[in-house]
Amino acid sequence: MLKPXGDRVVLKIEEKEQTVGGFVLAGSAQEKTKTAQVVATGQGVRTLNGDLVAPSVKTGDRVLVEAHAGLDVKDGDEKYIIVGEANILAIIEE
């Protein structure tokens, strides 16, 4: 299993038509974003004075992420992307 460092997040992209709260996203919005599930998170980032700031997402969250963000990786047969937390646009609450 992949364990990201810092503020990075491992995501599993959902390969289906994107909806948010039951609304289908317009075609142009789908081209700019992807829906994904958080698989793993890094420990967070440290502030200038050394305090650790935990990620705002957690394993299992569904998120909206920039379409071209991140790095494609494989772990066995599974495909994931690793993104910085700043590339996550929103948490999708069901």
From Swiss-Prot:
Task of the protein: Together with the chaperonin GroEL, plays an essential role in assisting protein folding. The GroEL-GroES system forms a nano-cage that allows encapsulation of the non-native substrate proteins and provides a physical environment optimized to promote and accelerate protein folding. GroES binds to the apical surface of the GroEL ring, thereby capping the opening of the GroEL channel.
MF term (GO), any: metal ion binding
Assembly notes: Heptamer of 7 subunits arranged in a ring. Interacts with the chaperonin GroEL.
TM stretches of this protein: none
Protein name: Co-chaperonin GroES
Predominant location category: cytoplasm
Record's subcellular location: Cytoplasm
One Pfam family recorded for the sequence: Cpn10
Gene3D superfamilies cross-referenced by the UniProt entry: GroES chaperonin
A single GO cellular-component term on record: cytoplasm
SUPFAM superfamilies documented for this protein: GroES-like (SSF50129)
Biological process annotations from GO: chaperone cofactor-dependent protein refolding
InterPro entries documented for this protein: Chaperonin_GroES, Chaperonin_GroES_sf, GroES-like_sf
This protein's UniProt keywords: Chaperone, Cytoplasm
Recorded family membership: Belongs to the GroES chaperonin family.
